[in-house]
Each structure stands twice: as structure tokens, then as C-alpha cells.
Amino acid sequence: MRIISQDGTVDVPYENVIIRVEGRTIEAYMGATYALMGVYQSTDDAIAVLREIVTYSREKYATYHMPQSNEVKNGRVQRL
């Protein structure tokens, strides 16, 4: 699975997040949450993005586009 960041580049570190998170509760893997908190406004927003990444990986989508920071509010991803 490829994950494409907001500027269109492929973010390799997020692929490691997919592997480590799959099959576990997302909240338990805080390393991924902290990495995403550098992009999004709150822990809830970071967890919302992480949930979406895991859902995409389980459903075997080939590519996941990271949402813009203004598309994640109150712990929900809302694509504009």
C-alpha cells in the first residue's frame, strides 16, 4: 500500500505504521499517533486519520491519500 502525503510525495514511514498497527487497537500504538499529531490538530484527529489508514489497508486499496489538516476536525475525517 502506498500512502501519498498532502504535497503529493509518497511517505515511506507511514507504511511502517500500517504494518505495526494492523490487528491491534489503534489507540495502543501511540508512536503512530504522535507522528500524525505533527500534521493534525489533536490526538483525536490523528487517531481518526490512523483509523482510516488501517481501514484502507485491510480493504486492500492500493493508494491512500493523506487528508489535508482542514479536512480533519473533531476526530473525524471529512473530505472536501
Regions found by a protein language model. Give the residues of each.
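Eukaryotic intrinsically disordered, low-complexity regulatory linkers and tails enriched in Ser/Thr/Pro
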Residues: 1-80
